[in-house]
């Protein structure tokens, strides 16, 4: 028994010695203990047992815009006046009483530029008609023309390809510019400048009706609640850009914005208006950053630059998406409530890229940051406005 006790004692001393050798003086030892995780707030709100959240309007407004893009603009399918009439009818009247034409740049902040923005859309319809062969004796034959420097046409190997695109004489795929106008001038404008306009949540009448639970006719929510929910609904269309993988600068953006929406809505329910304003500011700042990062990344990402270096035809869609993303930046907001960029400024960026031979000018586009009209130059200029650098938007692999 004594012998066994001696053996156990020796083993204990040996283990203690080994344990002490595995730690160095001053070393931080990671504990197995983890602080309990606080669950993310949920964007689910009810009144008398039924949901008080409704953003159906968002999809009803989006559907005709998606239809215009996919059925007519992307495929240059406005070969006859009847098709042009349908496109304009969808844009002017939409469906279910929601008219895209009336909702574009509808915020008071962009009222002064609204006419010019609508003219840009009209020009896209006109250019698409031309690319489609509208007014030509044989529209189908005219449409079957490959784009090249100074001449609009299809971009791809064959006219029958699935992923076909159509560019104007500058190499700009106008369908992608249309999307940029929609993402910025409707969705982003609705989020930041209409439904999250801080003046709404300071309005005495709206606050009083909200606190008295004065619901909108036939609905289960107050006017203030509905404004916040519609902002959240339109944000769903920006969510894929927020979730863009591999960009460290946006790594926390999704959860930050989601939490801000959920916490802001809860604060609104509890009449904590200071908290509502704090969350509103967070959404404004973070989503504006997302828009800027997206524009910069589309211009100078490895995908864009790689395709441009290999075959410019493969890069035109990405470059045009970048132009559309630049256009959308006029709808982003500073903390002060003023736009980061004006209509004229974003147009100047696009004009710089499309000057001369436009997006066909591979040498200029691939120039360094100091080269006017290069992708890096324009992206860097945008970055300065938002406090971002080209290094900030590099992917981590």
PLM features per residue range, with description:
Residues 26-397:
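Mature extracytoplasmic or organellar-lumen-exposed domains after removal of signal/transit peptides
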Residues 17-20:
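C-terminal motif of bacterial Sec signal peptides marking the signal peptidase cleavage site
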Residues 1-10:
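Bacterial N-terminal signal peptides that target proteins for export
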């Amino acid at each position: 028994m004594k012998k066994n006790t001696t053996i156990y004692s020796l083993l204990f001393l040996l283990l203690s010695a080994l344990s002490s050798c595995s730690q160095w003086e001053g070393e931080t030892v990671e504990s197995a203990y983890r602080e309990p995780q606080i669950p993310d707030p949920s964007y689910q709100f009810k009144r008398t047992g039924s949901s008080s959240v409704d953003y159906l309007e968002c999809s009803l407004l989006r559907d005709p815009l998606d239809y215009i893009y996919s059925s007519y603009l992307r495929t240059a399918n406005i070969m006859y006046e009847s098709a042009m009439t349908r496109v304009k009818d969808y844009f002017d009247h939409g469906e279910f009483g929601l008219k895209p034409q009336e909702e574009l740049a509808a915020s008071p902040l962009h009222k002064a530029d609204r006419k010019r923005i609508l003219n840009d859309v009209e020009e896209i319809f006109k250019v698409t008609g031309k690319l489609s062969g509208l007014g030509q004796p044989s529209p189908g034959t005219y449409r079957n023309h490959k784009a090249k420097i100074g001449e609009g046409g299809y971009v791809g190997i064959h006219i029958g390809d699935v992923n076909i695109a159509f560019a104007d004489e500058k190499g700009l795929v106008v369908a992608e510019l249309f999307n940029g106008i929609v993402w910025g001038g409707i969705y982003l404008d609705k989020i930041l400048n209409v439904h999250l306009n801080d003046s709404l949540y300071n309005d005495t009448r709206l606050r009083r009706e909200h606190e008295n639970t004065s619901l909108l006719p036939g609905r289960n929510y107050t006017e203030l609640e509905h404004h916040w929910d519609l902002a959240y609904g339109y944000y769903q269309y920006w969510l894929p850009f927020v979730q863009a993988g591999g960009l460290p600068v946006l790594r926390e953006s999704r959860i930050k914005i989601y939490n801000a929406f959920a916490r802001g809505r809860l604060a609104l329910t509890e009449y904590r208006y200071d908290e509502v304003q704090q969350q509103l500011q967070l959404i404004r700042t973070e989503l504006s950053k997302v828009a800027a990062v997206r524009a910069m990344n589309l211009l100078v990402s490895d995908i864009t630059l790689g395709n441009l270096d290999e075959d410019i035809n493969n890069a035109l869609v990405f470059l045009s998406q970048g132009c559309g993303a630049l256009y959308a930046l006029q709808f982003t907001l500073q903390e002060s409530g003023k736009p980061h960029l004006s209509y004229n400024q974003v147009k100047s960026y696009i004009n710089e890229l499309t000057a001369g031979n436009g997006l066909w000018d591979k040498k200029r586009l691939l120039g360094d940051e100091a080269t006017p009209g290069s992708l890096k130059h324009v992206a860097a200029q945008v970055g300065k406005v938002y406090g971002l650098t080209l290094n900030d938007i590099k992917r981590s692999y």
